Regions:
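As written
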Residues: 115-116
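Conserved nucleotide-cofactor-binding alpha/beta core module
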Residues: 104-106
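Active-site pocket-lining/capping segments in soluble small-molecule metabolic enzymes
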Residues: 1-102, 121, 129-174
């Protein structure tokens, strides 16, 4: 914030692709939202892992908590989570996580039709592919240019399971 960020991305204790990070408790999330908004900064909550049916009540709770704390939006991988967020907290922006593997014009347009206002496209794309997508969508686009150096396709990683016995698709990248 002190360096002038216009947005902050955070994870809660569950369903973040950075499961082993020191993610935010409900109280910490509320305080972070207040501080960000006091400074004119948006705060987005990452719910960017795959979900299973038995986790739906917990996902619903996370969505409600994010909305009640004042988050501006959610970064989502699972389309079921997107639908839940649309019903539970329609005021929240929905951003399609890079974990969704949206690497084509048709994929980005489908996300747009589902109500995503921003799409984080794959870091594997060439400049020409990025340009083609940007010329054919009204959704905001985001792309990682620094950070994780995945050797697989974003959102389709099984290397962590093979080498580390952990799932990168569930927030436990090895």
């Amino acid at each position: 914030l002190n360096a002038g960020a216009d947005a902050v991305y955070v994870g809660m204790k569950s369903f973040s692709a950075r499961k082993n990070a020191e993610n935010f408790s409900d109280d910490e999330l509320a305080a972070a939202c207040m501080e960000c908004h006091r400074r004119g900064v948006k705060l987005y909550v990452a719910l960017n892992t795959l979900m299973y049916d038995d986790e739906i009540p917990a996902v619903e709770k996370c969505i409600k908590t994010a909305a009640e704390c004042g988050a501006d939006g959610l970064i989502i991988q699972d389309i079921g989570t997107a639908e839940l967020s649309r019903r539970i907290a329609p005021q929240l922006e929905r951003h399609a996580s890079t974990q969704m593997t949206l690497n084509s014009v048709s994929g980005v347009k489908a996300a747009e039709e589902m109500g995503y206002s921003r799409v984080v496209i794959g870091r594997e794309l060439s400049f020409e592919q990025i340009k083609r997508i940007s010329e054919n969508t009204s959704a905001e686009l985001e792309i990682f240019v620094h950070g994780a150096l995945c050797v697989c396709v974003s959102g389709q990683c099984y290397m962590s399971s093979i080498f580390g016995g952990r799932s990168g698709n569930r927030g436990l990248c090895a």
